[in-house]
Amino acid sequence: MGLDQEDLDLTNDDHFIDKEKLSAPIKSTADKFQLVPEFLKVRGLVKQHLDSFNYFINVGIHKIVKANSRITSTVDPSIYLRFKKVRVGEPSIINVNTVENINPHMCRLADMTYAAPIFVNIEYVHGSHGNKAKSAKDNVIIGRMPIMLRSCRCVLHGKDEEELARLGECPLDPGGYFIIKGTEKVLLIQEQLSKNRIIIDSDKKGNINASVTSSTEMTKSKTVIQMEKEKIYLFLHRFVKKIPIIIVLKAMGMESDQEIVQMVGRDPRFSASLLPSIEECVSEGVNTQKQALDYLEAKVKKISYGTPPEKDGRALSILRDLFLAHVPVPDNNFRQKCFYVGVMLRRMIEAMLNKDAMDDKDYVGNKRLELSGQLISLLFEDLFKTMLSEAIKNVDHILNKPIRASRFDFSQCLNKDSRYSISLGLERTLSTGNFDIKRFRMHRKGMTQVLTRLSFIGSMGFITKISPQFEKSRKVSGPRSLQPSQWGMLCPCDTPEGESCGLVKNLALMTHVTTDEEEGPLVAMCYKLGVTDLEVLSAEELHTPDSFLVILNGLILGKHSRPQYFANSLRRLRRAGKIGEFVSVFTNEKQHCVYVASDVGRVCRPLVIADKGISRVKQHHMKELQDGVRTFDDFIRDGLIEYLDVNEENNALIALYESDGTTELDEGAEAAKADTTHIEIEPFTILGVVAGLIPYPHHNQSPRNTYQCAMGKQAMGNIAYNQLNRMDTLLYLLVYPQRPLLTTRTIELVGYDKLGAGQNATVAVMSFSGYDIEDAIVMNKSSLDRGFGRCIVMKKIVAMSQKYDNCTADRILIPQRTGPDAEKMQILDDDGLATPGEIIRPNDIYINKQVPVDTVTKFTSALSDSQYRPAREYFKGPEGETQVVDRVALCSDKKGQLCIKYIIRHTRRPELGDKFSSRHGQKGVCGIIIQQEDFPFSELGICPDLIMNPHGFPSRMTVGKMIELLGSKAGVSCGRFHYGSAFGERSGHADKVETISATLVEKGFSYSGKDLLYSGISGEPVEAYIFMGPIYYQKLKHMVLDKMHARGSGPRVMMTRQPTEGKSKNGGLRVGEMERDCLIAYGASMLIYERLMISSDPFEVQVCRACGLLGYYNYKLKKAVCTTCKNGDNIATMKLPYACKLLFQELQSMNVVPRLKLTEA
């Protein structure tokens, strides 16, 4: 059926078609946000710790036990023990005869370690020399493994909110930490240079070197090839000194100089660079493999404690097992190693000719992050091997004694002390944080830290913290600066100030850290895709210009003539789910290499795949996600989203928004759009958890965001739903925490809106009284009365009731209700312990305890009253402050001692000098508290809670704070939470200022957020419009009550006789160098004399006028004597600070003699 001419005209008519609609993207990108919470369900934040630990429990521990599965006696080789299977059980504790399951909350309260037994099934030979018999035992416990909370072996794994509440656990608590002896410990993420990769660098003298840190299951070694004075040498710790590299190549069987030159490259510049090294080799008289091996043999370090000499010579075995240890040597065929050295030499000479070819050690692609699973795996392997060697020693010891050998049972030797060694080793390392693994010469300190529970967000930030392997003392800017490669992987804001600035980093919101993938299938896949094996290549063919080397995890597999096709094929396979989702493929045009990586510890993040700039994720996919029929893993499986690591990002062109490039229709933008390979899921995910709390951070000056990251961790609020059941040493809680009126997407994702740490305060920005200079805040007394900024401080006190070896024990007595101590005991209950709910004052007794006088002598009968002495414990607190006994808990520790824990509660209202801060790094102390009657008020009768000085804005440039005030004001007036996510205006995750202003005008306020205020003192209108509205303020943990301190006289230090330091020791306040300079400038000489000597450490000395040295006063002769002149004729007495006298004597001990010249005053 044909159309009429008229209809045809209509269809051809341009007005009929909405061209804009056709050219617009399928649907705006604002809807992709839903992917972020879906991603956080399966990956990211704390999940990397859990994934890593789960990998160790499910895979790593089996590999370790399998690798060391059989141990044989050295005395009788037919006696052996074999491990068949290993598994980690449920967390439990062994009471006298029963096994009791435990949960994390119990462990926190009772100071236990949250650990599970490690079971093994064993097969072994037992019996005497004559009749040996095979036997098998199942479920033998070899030790206890501390369990990470929320991991696959944890009680909390997979539980819903109701079940978690039943176990006394907070559903918002992220897990990812261990409980060791009742304290929560986090194994920090460790940052390291990647293993098995060639890194080209230069030393201080400018010598170029190529280094490879090889790491295999068996050995870890570092190989350095360095160029010195145009000659190239190898440095390896087993050789005495540097060794010419050509000799090493000849020792590995590459005898022909021509082949060596071909292998590095035919370019004349390359051969010219190698010439001095080849000449040196000839001058040493080394031409054949045998001569080279003999030369190396002489250079091997002699090891005093002896491994027996290998049959094929030590030099060859070092080259095989330690030199580039990760490159395999099948049947003593060193060809692969030679080629590897060739590639290293080529890269070095390229770097020498062109400095751009050097590697950057701070580039994130050259870094690996070590997570808890890997660290515990190293530790467990070390302890397991120690246990096996101990078992063999025990067996040999028994077999050498014929009487005991007849009743011999191998499995008994395993149980003897071994299970304690593994349990204790793991517990001690996690408790102290000191990793000492002797086999790999690994000694690191501070690997674990106590999880600080100051605020909910503080503990979240703590778990995503990355600890550097770099000395903080070195003042280098390189590793500290913000690298472009950190985009999207590490948070650009969240780093501490001070010495560790830029070294300690935090993960961004959508970063994932990879775990290990199997290499075997990948290798096979590469060969199937047309990689030519190294074995069949000649040295000449290694660097043909049109083909690239293929390197998998630092191993050279071979060459490929169509590298781009190879890389794209691997990517297609990855998107189809045929190879692991975290495998990365990266072509490096400069180095003519294709790198394939599947190793552990790379940082990667998910991105939406785009075809010619158009996103693969369409509206219907997001609809399915919202309906719950599609998960994040489905997006990956269907090839809509993929994970890219830092190296592969270099091959991609990533757009922030799908519409990028379409706004300007010039040719450049169109071309860029056509080349776009990926689109960001959400731009605000480049920030971490802590920086995500800041509203409108992209409107603030950068260091302000960094300051807020540090202060947000110190803000008081709620720490968890179970906070009132916890027994923490110190707990700060806000009485009325609120949700921020101006919120961000991150706040909702993390759960900060449920456990906030601050309050929405109505702030007027104006000068008021003189008490608001330098960021101080003027506070409204009525607001404080209504509970603004009020907080609770809870402290734990522990008392022990001990049992002693001589069958005696402490006893707790009924308190005296009359008598001299009755007043101090009035808070005690009839059981001799403080009653919950009682008000406790300083010097009150909280436990009426008595201790046996003699705890050594054995007693058979009960002790009489006279054999006990009182050991009451008194409460120490700030004078004049009353506190409340909140809870009393009784529990027993490992040794069965009774442990009594008290929680003391103290409610504090804000006072002068307490520290507050907004979410924009603007901290200030309370300068004065003023009655509400004197405060200014608006025409609606609104009175501000705080008054802030306007001078805080110009130099700080925190425009985000101004927008927050407007947004919160609009939110209050229209009853909707407004959003201020980073970079969110374009995607709808941040309200624009225009729309906020429009809302304000609609609700009857000024569009600029300013109000007409009346003075509370005179009642007249204030002569300027005042910027007023709600801002979210945080109360920080720094409070005057904890810091305020002064003293008259008090304790002194023995050595210098000066007052001690610090509030806890009742110390003095030091007049330091700057204060001294200030007093000198004033010319207040008597004050200097009084402060620095009379009130500090005056000391009377006898000085000899003849020699100027110190003498002493002889009390027998009743006169002063000079030790040097041996008489007392010419001695004067004077006052010196004791520290000065000490300095003189210390100098004299170093042969420096200070002499005092005296004149009459």
From Swiss-Prot:
Molecular function as annotated in GO: DNA binding; DNA-directed RNA polymerase activity; ribonucleoside binding; zinc ion binding
Start-end of C4-type zinc fingers: 1104-1125
Pfam families named in the record: RNA_pol_Rpb2_1, RNA_pol_Rpb2_2, RNA_pol_Rpb2_3, RNA_pol_Rpb2_4, RNA_pol_Rpb2_5, RNA_pol_Rpb2_6, RNA_pol_Rpb2_7
Annotated keywords: DNA-directed RNA polymerase, Metal-binding, Nucleotidyltransferase, Nucleus, Transcription, Transferase, Zinc, Zinc-finger
Subunit annotation: Component of the RNA polymerase III (Pol III) complex consisting of 17 subunits.
PANTHER family: DNA-DIRECTED RNA POLYMERASE I SUBUNIT 2
UniProt record similarity statement: Belongs to the RNA polymerase beta chain family.
Protein name from the UniProt record: DNA-directed RNA polymerase III subunit 2
Organism: Arabidopsis thaliana
Gene designation per UniProt: NRPC2
